[in-house]
Amino acid sequence: ASNFTKFYFEDFRETLQKYPAHDKAFSIWQQGITNGVFMPQFHGREHLQYKRWLKVLQAGNKDALYCFDHGTTYSGKGDYSFMEAYDWDHPGDVEEHKKIIAEGLFLFKNVFGFASKSFIAPCYNWDPEIEGVLKSNGVRWLQGLRNQMVPTGSFDHYTILPHYFGEVNQLGLKYNIRNCFLEPSLLPGKDWVDSCLAQI
């Protein structure tokens, strides 16, 4: 109805209800939390750079519109499914990211009953300017790869900030660095097990 000029997010529990055989997923997660099997962490309100996505939809990209109509992702030329939620095209976008993060952390606490103590940015990229809102909402650890990818205003061009496990930044947030990289969906033909073992 808005001709792709406005973005509406959806609670992930509603999304789970729409997928076949996922209607019990959240209750299983709750059992896992109760039994100490896993602990959720904040990854974002959505895993989407929605402004770029809306721009492609507004432009009438047929493939993107087809995917939208069928409720699936679009991995077209350039931007990889628009998944890098905290990347930006204009420095002013960071202020909106802060609001989205604050809202997402509020939702996280309401959904799970506790505040997230850690954060991992979608696609491992974020502007250090968002870290204050993370801290003020209870986050104590920033999880990522060995190198943080800081947005520059151009997709897939980042300033690299190296980090090490246990490093403490100026805000007192600590870095939890993954000791290996496992993203099988990126290269389905790759032997990810051997790759991970080699990295460890």
Task: Name the predicted role of every residue range.
Residues 16-24, 52, 117-129, 148-157, ...:
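Acidic-and-aromatic substrate-binding clefts and catalytic sites of carbohydrate-active enzymes
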Residues 95, 102, 106-118, 175-200:
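Catalytic grooves of carbohydrate-active enzymes
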Residues 37-41, 116-118, 140-141, 173-175:
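Structural preference for beta-strand elements that scaffold enzyme active sites
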Residues 22-43, 58-67, 136, 165-169, ...:
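Acidic (Asp/Glu)-rich catalytic clusters
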Residues 1-50, 120-121:
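Active-site beta->alpha N-cap acidic-glycine motif
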Residues 8-13, 59-89:
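Aromatic- and acidic-residue-enriched carbohydrate-binding clefts of CAZyme catalytic domains
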Residues 88-161:
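Catalytic domains of cell-wall/extracellular-matrix polysaccharide-remodeling enzymes
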Residues 1-3, 40-76:
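Short, solvent-exposed beta-strand-terminating loops
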